[in-house]
C-alpha cells in the first residue's frame, strides 16, 4: 500500500521545468496547451488543498497535481505507477464516458439503454471490435512492458471504481444511480478496444454503396465527372513521394489494378433495399461522421521559427461531445515525461510530446473499406459461392443482453472478405483493414517513449487504423510528416463501389508496403502541413482514396506559414485561431458575378448579396455574411 497524494494547485518550488522543450509545443483541441508549464504560474503549496490516500497496487508514493485548468500532472517512481494514477484520475473525472465507449466498442449498449440500441450492438459485434481486442491481448506481439502498463492502468481505474462502489454504490456518479447499474471492473481488453473503436469511427463509411447506386443510375462517365479521382487544383500533403526531392514513385512498381477506374457494375435487384438498410445502421451508430469534420496539423523547423527549434501544432476536429473526447494529462516517471491528450479509457497519449519529440495527427481520409456482393441462395444455407464452389460461412453465435428483456441470440456470418452486414436485400460483406487484431497500442506506446526520428518511424509500422497523417518534430531539429496506415492493394478496380465477391477478381492482394507510403523529411520550404487533403500528387502509383477534403484549409495554412518568418508560439496560436474562409474567398466572387449577370429575388435577397459583396471573408461570430454563405453552401445542388 502506498500514498496517493493529490494537490489541487502547483507549488512554486516544484522543480519540473523542461527548458529543453521550450520551443517544442503541441497545440491541441479548441484551446492551446503549451509546454513547458511554468511553476510560478500557480499558487504556492500553502494555498493548495491536499488529500492523501492509501491505495493497493501502487509500488511507491505518487503525486498528482492539478493546475488551474484541472489538468493532472502525475509524478511517479515507475511508469506502472504513473499509469495507475492516470487510470485513477480518468475514472475520477470521466467514468461514465468511459463506460459508454466501452459499451459502444463491445456491443453492450442495449444492456443499459434498452432495445433502441440493439442494432448498434449487433453492427459493432459483426465488425468484431471486442473480438479483435481480445485477440490483441492474447497475442505474443504485446511485450511485457505494455502488458504491465495496461494492467497498472486498469488497476488504477478499478481502485477508483472500488472507492465509488462503497456504501452500495451511492458514491457513483448520479447517472449510474439513475440508470440503476454498476460498472464492471476495467480490463486490458477494454483499454485495447478503445483505439480500435475510434479507428472504425474514423474509417467506416457506406459511401461505396451509394456510389454503386449512382453508377448504375447515372452511368460511369457522369459519376466520374461528378466525383473525379484526380482533381488538379488539390494541394497534396506531400508534393513528391518519399524524402524531400526524391522523385515521385522512385523504386515503386505500380500496383495491379491501381490505374484507371473500376468497370461499371450490374447491381442485383434488391441492392437498393440493402443500401437503405446499411445507411440506416450507419446513421444510427453515427459512423463515418468524419466527412463532416476535419483536422489540421503543421510544423515549422528551426530556420523558420523565432527560437531556432521546431514548433508543431496539432488541431484535431473530432465531433462535439460533452465531456470532450480528449483528456489532457502530464506524466513523469523514470524514462517517461509525456504531455498531451489521451482518451479516457486508454493509457497512452494520442497527441503530444515527451522531452525529445512531438507529434500530431490528422485523419488521412483514405479508402480502407470495401463492400463485396456475395452470392448466396436458399438452397445452400450458411454458404456462399466463391471461385466456383460453395463454401461454408464462418459463423459466430453470440447473445446480446437487452435491458428488461431476454438476451437476443445473434449469429454473425462472415465470408473470406469480411462480415455480412446487411439484414435485408443482397448480402454485402464488409472488408476493412482493421478487421482482426491490429496493434495501435504498440504504435502509441512507442511514440510516447520515442527519442528521435528512427523511433518515430518504427512506431508508425504498427499504426494500422485509422490511416493518419502523423506529423513530427524533435530537438535535433528534424521535422517530418507520414501519411500512414494499413491500406489495401486491390487486384482489380478501386473499390469505389461494391464489387462482385464470388469471382475473387476483386480481392485484396495485401497492403501498401510501409516504405512505399508517402513520407517527407526536412523540406526546403521549412514547414509541413496536412488538413485531410490528398496525401500524394496525381501519379502516385497506389490508390489511396478519393474523398479528400478540398484544399482550402491546406492552402490557407501554407499561405500563413509561407509569408511569415521568425514565427513564435504566439504566432502559431494566432494561426490556429485564424478565421479566414478560403472557400468563400474562392466561390463568393463567382456567385456575385452570376447574380450580376442575371439579378433575381426580392429586397431580402439583394441585402444578402450586398452583405456578401462587402465581406472580407473573415468567419467571425458577428459576421452576417458568413452565416449567409453557410446557408448558400448548404443548399442542394
What residue ranges belong to the model's regions?
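Substrate-recognition/specificity elements adjacent to catalytic centers across diverse enzyme folds
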Residues: 42-311, 316, 322, 335
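N-terminal secretory signal peptides that target proteins for export/translocation
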Residues: 1-14
